[in-house]
């Protein structure tokens, strides 16, 4: 799949993209799914999932702590197995798939990128809040200097206009990013909101870089939004097999492939094989199904970063406050990734309000 004869370079040299594909799908079960699993992946689980996804034809598999390189910490949650070990294991297991890793400037370091590459990662995905693309410039420079393929994540893309998002995408592309993603971190975008943002970024970047979309299921629109993104010009799409991701999960890869097959979008992934992988390999590794429940819906409706879910549940139990109330108030305050600790302040605030009201 990754040979010189089967790989077409589109727009920017060095992008892993087979000439037979219309869209490149990245499975992020082993990164976004880390949030749902509280970062407790084992080596055996990663080996089995990578083998199953690779066998189904998934071209890119992302493996990292949920919050990216260096995310194993008190604030975000400690990994059961060091992420660098998992990246190395994934790279050793995959036959055709490329292994991607995520890093957030300020959480991970340039040294982490170098180590991940040494362990077999070949696609470096760098994420910033959608208004802070400038903090990624040096990291893209390093990644390109080292021959890594680069992807940029503009997180919480629902919070700014398509025009402003396009300007931020330009910063990433000029820094060396080969594909800029519109990232619906909260699962808050609805159909046209995705299409308008993707189209604006496509128009801004032209042939300088590809455009991607990363969706969540918090309003039940992960697949539909991904279709809107493709129709607006996106060439890379994220999903998680069995919706294994933060919040209500990501767009399920097996459903994406089924729909893509129906509408004639070629991905190189076999529908039946990915459905088998979801049912027989990924599902057993999940602590529970990713549910579209009240908490998840509140996140999508209020625009809350999807990884807040487990933190809100934990703080809600600790302080005797319903998690959905914490999440709604987090949305009102427009909290972003990295501000999970403020859920404690919100919980104490609601506690005081309840006490004052005799509850």
UniProtKB/Swiss-Prot annotation:
Where are the membrane-spanning stretches? none
Q: Where is the active site?
A: 35
Keyword annotations for this protein? Answer: Aromatic hydrocarbons catabolism, Lyase, Manganese, Metal-binding
Name the site position(s) for Transition state stabilizer: 31
Uppermost EC category:
lyase
Q: Which GO terms describe its biological process?
A: catabolic process; L-leucine biosynthetic process
Q: Which reaction does it catalyse?
A: (S)-4-hydroxy-2-oxopentanoate = acetaldehyde + pyruvate
Its recorded name reads 4-hydroxy-2-oxovalerate aldolase 1
What organism does the record attribute this protein to? Answer: Mycobacteroides abscessus (strain ATCC 19977 / DSM 44196 / CCUG 20993 / CIP 104536 / JCM 13569 / NCTC 13031 / TMC 1543 / L948) (Mycobacterium abscessus)
């Amino acid at each position: 799949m990754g040979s010189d004869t089967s790989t077409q370079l589109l727009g920017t040299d060095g992008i892993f993209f087979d000439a037979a594909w219309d869209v490149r799908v990245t499975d992020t079960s082993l990164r976004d799914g880390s949030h749902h699993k509280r970062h407790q992946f084992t080596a055996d689980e990663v080996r089995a999932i990578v083998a199953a996804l690779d066998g189904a034809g998934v071209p890119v598999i992302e493996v990292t702590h949920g919050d990216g390189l260096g995310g194993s910490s008190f604030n975000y949650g400690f990994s059961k197995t060091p992420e660098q070990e998992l990246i190395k294991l994934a790279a050793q297991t995959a036959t055709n798939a490329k292994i991607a890793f995520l890093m957030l400037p300020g959480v991970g370091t340039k040294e982490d990128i170098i180590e991940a590459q040494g362990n077999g990662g070949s696609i470096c995905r760098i994420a910033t809040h959608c208004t802070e693309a400038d903090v990624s410039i040096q990291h893209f420079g390093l990644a390109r200097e080292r021959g890594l393929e680069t992807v940029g994540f503009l997180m919480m893309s629902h919070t700014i206009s398509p025009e402003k998002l396009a300007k931020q995408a330009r910063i990433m592309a000029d820094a060396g990013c080969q594909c800029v993603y519109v990232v619906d971190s909260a699962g808050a975008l609805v159909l046209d909101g995705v299409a308008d943002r993707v189209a604006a970024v496509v128009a801004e970047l032209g042939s300088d870089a590809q455009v991607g979309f990363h969706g969540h299921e918090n309003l039940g629109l992960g697949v539909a939004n991904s279709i809107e993104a493709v129709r607006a010009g996106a060439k890379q799409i994220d999903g998680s097999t069995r919706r294994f991701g933060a919040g209500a999960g990501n767009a399920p890869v097996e459903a994406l492939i089924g729909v893509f097959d129906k509408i004639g979008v070629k991905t190189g992934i076999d529908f039946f094989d990915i459905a088998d992988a979801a049912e027989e390999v990924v599902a057993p590794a999940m602590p529970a199904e990713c549910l579209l429940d009240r908490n998840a819906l509140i996140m999508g409706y209020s625009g809350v970063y999807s990884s807040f879910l487990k933190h809100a549940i934990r703080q809600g139990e600790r302080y005797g406050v319903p998690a959905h109330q914490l999440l709604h108030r987090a949305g009102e305050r427009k909290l972003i990734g990295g501000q999970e600790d403020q859920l404690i302040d919100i919980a104490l605030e609601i506690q005081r309000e309840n006490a004052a009201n005799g509850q």
